[in-house]
Swiss-Prot record:
A zinc finger (RING-type) spans 31-81, 194-223. Zn(2+) 2 binds at C122, C127, C146, C149. Auto-ubiquitinated. E3 ubiquitin-protein ligase which accepts ubiquitin from E2 ubiquitin-conjugating enzymes UBE2L3 and UBE2L6 in the form of a thioester and then directly transfers the ubiquitin to targeted substrates such as LCMT2, thereby promoting their degradation. Induces apoptosis via a p53/TP53-dependent but caspase-independent mechanism. Plays a crucial role in maintaining the genomic stability by controlling the degradation of multiple proteins involved in mitotic progression and DNA damage. Regulates epithelial homeostasis by mediating degradation of CDKN1A and isoform 2 of TP63. InterPro entries: E3_UB_ligase_RBR, IBR_dom, TRIAD_supradom, Znf_RING, Znf_RING/FYVE/PHD, Znf_RING_CS. The active site is at C207. It comes from Bos taurus (Bovine). SMART domains: IBR, RING. This is E3 ubiquitin-protein ligase RNF144B.
Amino acid sequence: MGSVGRLHCLTMTAAENPTPGDLALVPLVTCKLCLCEQSLDKMTTLQECRCIFCTACLKQYMQLAIREGCGSPITCPDMVCLNHGTLQEAEIACLVPVDQFQLYQRLKFEREVHLDPCRTWCPVADCQTVCPVATSDPGQPVLVECPSCHLKFCSCCKDAWHAEVSCRDSQPGILPTEHGTLFGTETDAPIKQCPVCRVYIERNEGCAQMMCKNCKHTFCWYCLQNLDNDIFLRHYDRGPCRNKLGHSRASVMWNRTQVVGILVGLGIIALVTSPLLLLASPCIICCVCKSCRGKKKKHDPSTT
């Protein structure tokens, strides 16, 4: 198996190692990641889109994508890739260490379960069992029983099963089980669910403005209010979450100053470029009209 895996890795490279007499004839290719010129024996071509990068950069990119991607498909690192290529598992296994590839497979499986409406995870922290979910109407809660710990919970909110109460009206709290304790949405709970995708998030310390790594939703840790559009962090100036951001007043003011500076800079750029666009617009319109007129004459049969 070791020799087969090594043979597969070698076939992924763009060329074989050149002989010493052919070094002067070896072409150099520019890597789109590090912008350095490398010989073909140090490059790797992706199978799906045929984009080529140096092997060292591709290894670093894959390891970073595995750690930050939560099991999502690893796409071609070229932002303007015309084929929108995706790396195959054989390529990933060839270029990253074994433990990194095992982590990728585990995260990929967890993501598949999360996106599958017929499967869900047991909410008990140390159970980690995949439970089957009966088919139902979209958004309709279904009773789910874990085959391992036999916990009965709701398929939508993952709280204890509430037959006569909706998920919104149910009171989430501590779920005692023989395996441990699952925290709900109390203010001091260390584990809460994302208000959008319901993924469990643990907060140890630091800022109270949270961003879900799964759906990128930004919310307040204490009251779960939506903060996607609160760029000035005004939520923590009033109400029950006043002064609970977790940062000093000076750092908050500095953050607001930076945001204002960025907005003012964009406004200045717009003001400076708008007269130039107005002056250049007649030339642009003339060029477009000339091009359209030329195409019309080309396709007009009376001119032939």
